[in-house]
Amino acid sequence: MATNFLVGEKIWFHKFKYGDAERRFYEQMNGPVAGASLQEASMILHDIARARENIPKSLAGSLGPGASSGPSGDHSELVVRIASLEVDNQRDLAERAGEELARPLGHSPADPAHVSHAPSGAPGQEASHTSRG
């Protein structure tokens, strides 16, 4: 008699529908799925790499003979800006790499506190004090 109330319940027979609905709800609340964002990130990285390859070609073509001095031909500010961004990017990458390498060690490479000093009562110092006395 206690199991008769489950006869009218269909939630367990349609659990996959509720599971799919719940998954869609949380995906909408939290944003896109991680797999899609990884794919988008790889496409963006591919586009950046292609743009980096095309920048020197484009600049070499604009600095060549017959380059106009108009708005489309004056790329000096753009060249300076790109160079500064590249330097900043390399510096940031180097800093992040240093932080990632230092993280397992538990200290920063620039932190002088990680250098171990001999305690004041080191055996070498005690021997020098006893030999004088």
Curated annotation (Swiss-Prot):
Residues 58-73 have a biased composition (Low complexity). Residues 58-77, 89-133 are annotated as: Disordered. Keywords: Elongation factor, Protein biosynthesis. It comes from the Eukaryota. Disulfide bonds: none annotated. One of its GO terms (molecular function) is translation elongation factor activity. The keyword Protein biosynthesis applies. Belongs to the EF-1-beta/EF-1-delta family. This is Putative elongation factor 1-delta-like protein.
